[in-house]
Amino acid sequence: MNKLESPSEIDVAGPSPRHKTTQVMVGNVAVGGGAPIVVQSMTNTDTADIEGTIAQVAALSRAGSEMVRMTVDRDEAAAAVPHIRDGLRKRGITTPLIGDFHYIGHKLLADHPSCAEALDKYRINPGNVGFKDKRDKQFTDIVETAIKYGKAVRIGANWGSLDQELLTHLMEENANSAAPLDARAVTREAMVQSALLSAKRAEEIGLPKTRMVLSAKVSAVQDLIAVYQTLASRSDYAIHLGLTEAGMGSKGIVASSAALGILLQQGIGDTIRISLTPEPGGDRTLEVQVAQELLQTMGFRTFVPLVAACPGCGRTTSTTFQELARSIQDFIRDEMPNWKTQYPGVEQLNVAVMGCIVNGPGESKHADIGISLPGTGEAPAAPVFVDGKKFKTLRGPAIAQDFKALVIDYIEQRYGDAAKARAEAVSAAE
């Protein structure tokens, strides 16, 4: 008889403890300091297009983005920001807004105080905040504006716009070293130093750690991992993760998930953005969905009910289970904005849609509610399991519609008014 082995490295499953960072409030959202990892997104509208930007921020917020960044690149964009904020509030949307500033941020914030006041956080790129003798003055101007209005700041170094003076200095220093590093290693060090030196300067000006978030974005996965590991080892600032220029479609999703997944597993990261290049006319909210799915798949947070579905094989020549899995998944995601308030806790629901008898019944039993559809050559019957027990068997051409109705009924019974009434009755009896 086989015996359970003594506890070993397999008895614990989970990420490393979270890297300890200083908590920062961005509007009404806590970042770092043990707070849940925050999902961030960015608009791609012309910020001067007030109605268009309001619509996209609203869509991103509805999809689950907890902070939204937008470009503030000229006077017209800066002037639009307070109107965007006001328009969102009229819709009941209080998602924190982040202004993305490059080159002339100091001037835009000074010339448009209503913009400075309306934003919840300013993003500064130390590589282009100013050049030569203007850098310190322009950086100081932005930081002092943040102090004046009580705003948070993200100091975001970027591989594509790195501080060239710092990089040149480190390259020359490396060339004269007895054991020089390769150029990419020096560039990674420049990324880390750019962020940390800028943060130190911001503190000297008067901005506390409680208002600072750091990032150091790279487009290559291994470089990004190394940069953030080093950044985390040298500081306790809140950290924003993102793979810059990740790309389109599956390439962008895979690259971002690979890089961020490793860092998150190591306990690094307080807020994330999945920077996907959208298809022409594509849905901007996809980046929010991918970020949520990454965090939920890794067990950090729950956003929407999970739908488990088998990949299909020669036993499942019918597309019925695929169509049902897609229908259930789309239905759940579309309804979640309403369900959040109507059915508290529904995001923890697990649904299984399986395609044949091999794994179907077992996986369905592990889910809260699951169905095992008939595979090729199997009897045209689909057993449904609820809370691990067989509930009923569906037959006929309307199996998909019938199962969807059962899912809706299960949600109502477990998370709706009936569930609340049962809980209140139990509480009263005690």
Curated annotation (Swiss-Prot):
Which keywords, in A-to-Z order, does the entry hold? 4Fe-4S, Iron, Iron-sulfur, Isoprene biosynthesis, Metal-binding, Oxidoreductase
GO BP terms in the entry: isopentenyl diphosphate biosynthetic process, methylerythritol 4-phosphate pathway; terpenoid biosynthetic process
In terms of superkingdom, the source organism counts as Bacteria
Record carries keyword S-adenosyl-L-methionine = no
Give the binding site residues for [4Fe-4S] cluster.
Answer: C310, C313, C356, E363
Q: What is its EC number?
A: 1.17.7.3
Known pathway: Isoprenoid biosynthesis; isopentenyl diphosphate biosynthesis via DXP pathway; isopentenyl diphosphate from 1-deoxy-D-xylulose 5-phosphate: step 5/6
Q: How is the cofactor bound?
A: Binds 1 [4Fe-4S] cluster.
Read off the Pfam families from this record. GcpE (PF04551)
Q: Which reaction does it catalyse?
A: (2E)-4-hydroxy-3-methylbut-2-enyl diphosphate + oxidized [flavodoxin] + H2O + 2 H(+) = 2-C-methyl-D-erythritol 2,4-cyclic diphosphate + reduced [flavodoxin]
Query: Per UniProt, what is one GO molecular function of this protein?
Result: iron ion binding
Q: Which cofactor does it need?
A: [4Fe-4S] cluster
Looking up InterPro entries in the UniProt record yields: Dihydropteroate_synth-like_sf, IspG_bac, IspG_bac-typ, NO2/SO3_Rdtase_4Fe4S_sf
Q: Which residues cross the membrane?
A: none
Family stated for the protein in its record? Belongs to the IspG family.
- For this entry, the protein name equals 4-hydroxy-3-methylbut-2-en-1-yl diphosphate synthase (flavodoxin)
**Source organism (scientific name):** Nitrobacter winogradskyi (strain ATCC 25391 / DSM 10237 / CIP 104748 / NCIMB 11846 / Nb-255)
